[in-house]
Amino acid sequence: MNIENKEITSSWFTNLRDLLCKEFEKIEEEYAQTKGLKPAKFVRSSWQRNGGGGGVMSLMKGAVFEKVGVNISTVFGKISPEFRNEIPGVELDGKFFATGISLVAHLKSPLIPAMHFNTRYIETSKSWFGGGGDLTPFYPEKNETVKFHAAFKEACDKYDSSYYPKFKKQCDEYFYLKHRKEPRGVGGIFYDYLNNGNFEQDFAFTQDVGKALLSVYPEIVRSKLFLPWTAEQKEYQLIRRGRYVEFNLLYDRGTKFGLMTDGNVEAILMSLPPEVKFN
């Protein structure tokens, strides 16, 4: 396994975590100042994995972000034999290394979309990058959806014109609730097992995906920061959040990978919304 690759990827995910947390705290401050509130801050807690490695959870519950979590982790060791068929390159000895960042934002306002983002680097006897970002509005708006997709398309097009249509399609297919026959949101991009034989290029692309998210999502949040909403709209948001829960518990690869590798349960389930209704 390549030690330098491990270090620079892990360092980037930590840096991106800091940039995202800083920007989200800034949004909370902007809102709090106009409402006479004390701005919320992220609370961090670290955890260690028994088999090797660990991570840091950053969680904020505020007036804008009802719950936003930004997790980073770097874990390594051996995967249990019963799970070795599910991850490429661990079939023989089970050894793995994984580092990444995961972000989920649930907003108080039903007019502001929820958002999920993650990027990761994994080494077994093979190595690859994966990740992406997707938007889940409760009241979709075309301009907003176009803006979100355009940010990721720009990042993709720097590297390969085939990336965006391919990764968009993969996102649409991945974030689909088969049992309900409906998409979870308005999509974005999703990629996995990315290894073009050029680590530097694949890593640069993964960094640009993170930068795209950092540029577009805060802009979307700010555009609706002070819009009024009704109790009926909030009720609808809580019901639709149920779809989020269903997907994460039934289909999400990150949830499954975390549980298979004996990750921190609180960090793995951080993506779940703080309040939800099932009718």
From Swiss-Prot:
Substrate binds at residues 102, 118-120. Residues 244-279 are annotated as: Important for dimerization. It is found in: Cytoplasm. The active site is at 116 (proton donor). The record marks 179 as: Important for dimerization. Transmembrane segments: none annotated. A divalent metal cation binds at residues 106, 116, 149, 179. The keyword Cytoplasm applies. InterPro entries: Coprogen_oxidase_aer (IPR001260), Coprogen_oxidase_aer_sf (IPR036406), Coprogen_oxidase_CS (IPR018375). It catalyses: coproporphyrinogen III + O2 + 2 H(+) = protoporphyrinogen IX + 2 CO2 + 2 H2O. Keywords: Cytoplasm, Heme biosynthesis, Metal-binding, Oxidoreductase, Porphyrin biosynthesis. Its main location: cytoplasm. One of its GO terms (biological process) is protoporphyrinogen IX biosynthetic process. Its EC number is 1.3.3.3. SUPFAM superfamilies: Coproporphyrinogen III oxidase. GO terms for molecular function: coproporphyrinogen oxidase activity; metal ion binding; protein homodimerization activity. Its cofactor is a divalent metal cation. Pathway: Porphyrin-containing compound metabolism; protoporphyrin-IX biosynthesis; protoporphyrinogen-IX from coproporphyrinogen-III (O2 route): step 1/1. It holds the Pfam family Coprogen_oxidas. Involved in the heme biosynthesis. Catalyzes the aerobic oxidative decarboxylation of propionate groups of rings A and B of coproporphyrinogen-III to yield the vinyl groups in protoporphyrinogen-IX. Homodimer. HAMAP family: Coprogen_oxidas. Belongs to the aerobic coproporphyrinogen-III oxidase family. This is Oxygen-dependent coproporphyrinogen-III oxidase. The gene is hemF.
